[in-house]
Amino acid sequence: MSRIGKKPIAVPSGVEITIDGQHVSVKGPKGTLTHTVAEPITVTRGEDGQLEVTRPNDERRNRSLHGLTRTLIANMIEGVTKGYEKKMEIFGVGYRVQAKGSNLEFALGYSHPVPVEAPEGITFAVESPTKFSVSGIDKQKVGQISAVIHGLRKPDPYKGKGIRYAGEVVRRKVGKTGK
């Protein structure tokens, strides 16, 4: 049995869960998320209103989907109650970010500004020209848009310039030595 998969999922008060066949819908104070569960995995309401994820047998695919499904549903519940946020920082001379409505516009040393549109359900908050955050209720979307922004100008190993996640440690390389 998957150690993660066999743990029941606690449902906090204020969260409404609807199970319709293979579709699980989670509604909370911050919004609604839905997920389609892969075919052999079943989600049921157990005792004390907790959710239980079960698999029919121990085939390799079913074992891997078991823990994954449980974690995805737990992330949905946390998303609609607390939400997710990734803080990011910009290092480098002249590198900055500014809010343009609900979107962001980056100056990253290119000859043109780089715009980033906020997908549905994602909000950007600019704290300073070099610090901003990405937040939303869907953990996957928050991580995906953060990775796209990070990829616009990855941290340089020689000078450390670029966009980083808050707390990210950039391994620095030693430059060439002159004669």
Swiss-Prot record:
GO terms for cellular component: cytosolic large ribosomal subunit. The keyword Ribonucleoprotein applies. GO terms for molecular function: rRNA binding; structural constituent of ribosome. GO terms for biological process: cytoplasmic translation. This protein binds to the 23S rRNA, and is important in its secondary structure. It is located near the subunit interface in the base of the L7/L12 stalk, and near the tRNA binding site of the peptidyltransferase center. Part of the 50S ribosomal subunit. NCBIfam families: L6_bact. This is Large ribosomal subunit protein uL6. The gene is rplF.
